[in-house]
Curated annotation (Swiss-Prot):
Origin: domain of life: Bacteria
Stored SUPFAM superfamilies: Glyoxalase/Bleomycin resistance protein/Dihydroxybiphenyl dioxygenase
A UniProt-annotated Pfam family: Glyoxalase
Cross-link (Isoglutamyl lysine isopeptide (Lys-Gln) (interchain with Q-Cter in protein Pup)): 76
The protein's name in its UniProt record: Uncharacterized protein MSMEG_6630
Amino acid sequence: MSDHEVKMVVLSTENLDESIKFYETLGFSLKFRDGAHFAALDGGAVTLALATPVDHPIPGKVVVGIKTADVDAAAKEIEATGGAIIKGPYDDAHERRAVVYDNTGNGLVFYSPLKR
């Protein structure tokens, strides 16, 4: 079994309220909202996240969020296998993150909750 688990898909939006309303009409309920720039919707096993450019890892792109125990090691692994680190690894308010491109340019964000 992999140490990495796909847990989130991040979509870009310029208007968080309109996007939340759109996805709620499809039956996705709001799990979490951070101001006017980020929302997490219940997509079952995978969270559907909506983010404005303020909080989006790669604005304008679809990004897959992968939960992992070791963000730093995952980022190094990406670099070693032909991908590229875009940002990080770094700590934000809630988690450790690394924003990367895979070997074909797809956006990924590896993350792990910070231990408090």
